[in-house]
Amino acid sequence: MSAMSLRPDVLSARRVLAVQPHPDDNEIGAGALIARLRDQGCDVRYVTVTDGSMGTMDPDMAPAELAGLRRREADAAASLLGVSENRHLGHRDLLDSPMPGLRAELMQEIGEFRPDFVLTCDPWLPYEAHPDHRAVGMAVAEAVSFLQFPHVPGAPKDAPAQPVVAFYGTAQPNVRIPAGPYWQRKWEAVARHQTQFPPDALIQLRAFAESMSQGEEGFFEPFKVLHPFFLHFNPAAVLA
């Protein structure tokens, strides 16, 4: 059994659950892939775990007001990529981590939607300081790992097959997916998050991303794609 044989092609996905810690993470990490999958007819559903209410440096911006703005921005960005359903779980940004019940919530989301792939942020990213990113990525990995164990809290009664996990925002990618014409749409979607990225900040973010994602055939998005086989007691995961 080789690592390659256990690395299904995410571009062949038919149903993808994209789980983001904050309202802008899916677009930043995987916006081009999501747009491409939707154009191919793949069914994509978002799950947004936190309300993003701490994401401001403005002392006059009330958290509740920001949460409302960010929810509207998130739905607009998803819509631009062709995603019509965004499930907002409503956890408080930063304040609710480590979110001990999140694994069970995500097991229910996976059980209901029955995806063949789950997209989320890589909780093993070195030096990741945001607890929401660590908590959400790990909760996704745990939810996939324990999905078919009926006595684990949150396990669905009619558990589907375990989906493959594609981690974005990773330092150890094993797949680099060419963005092609979807690169521009990705950044149009990121631009919908106006509370997070005023024009100057958006220009800087895009320039940095392009400096890190330039391949021989144009820009790409990197992912660590892991079959569930690699999510427990498997040192080969780092090489997968």
Model-identified regions with their sequence ranges:
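Active-site rim/loop-helix segments in enzyme catalytic domains that contact anionic ligands
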Residues: 1-113
